[in-house]
Amino acid sequence: MIQRLIRRLRRDRRGATIIEFAIITPVMMLLLMGLMDMLFQQYAQSILTGAVQKAGRDSTIQGADTSAVDAKVVTMMHSLLATPSQSCPSTTATTWCSARFAYDNFTEVAPEPFTDSNNNGKCDNGEPFSDVNANGTWDANPGASGEGGAGSVALYTMTITYKHLFPVATMLGWSSTATIQASTLLKNQPYATQAVTPTITGTCP
């Protein structure tokens, strides 16, 4: 009798689905939340990219109020920034940071070229370099802070940090915030004569 009961229990599969469901569900939920969070980040990145491109075009117009341009970008990102605040660098949730650099032309949007005689990837040991901004020192970013003048090439960058939609990142020990960034490079409208900084040759320290 007892042996028959044991054999019947061994063959009985009722309730197995519930146990399997209980084991699989948490893993599936984590995967779904992680996927949704990634998709939302891609969506936010596309919105930010479009907003920055539009803002960059607005900034190239003579007399443009750059603070108003920034405000428009932040407004377009209201789904991420319920109570936005400016903070540079943008490292905490619901903060944003904008940066503008001006160059004489598109080729200057790069580290100043230098002769790497010792092949260490650094400008040092008296190596000659092209001082694009004529400030006497080698610069990884030779751009001048700000929007620049007529005909200048302006690099506009907006960085936004927001809190993840789901707690998956925190559960995995990662940061509870995500940071996205978008940049646009445009030439200012030639509403006046452009002032070009002459390039001189310098030596690395």
Question: Which residue ranges define each predicted feature?
Answer:
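Short, conserved structural patches
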Residues: Q3, Q53-P205
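Alpha-helical assembly-interface signal, strongest on the long, hydrophobic N-terminal helix that forms
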Residues: M1-L80
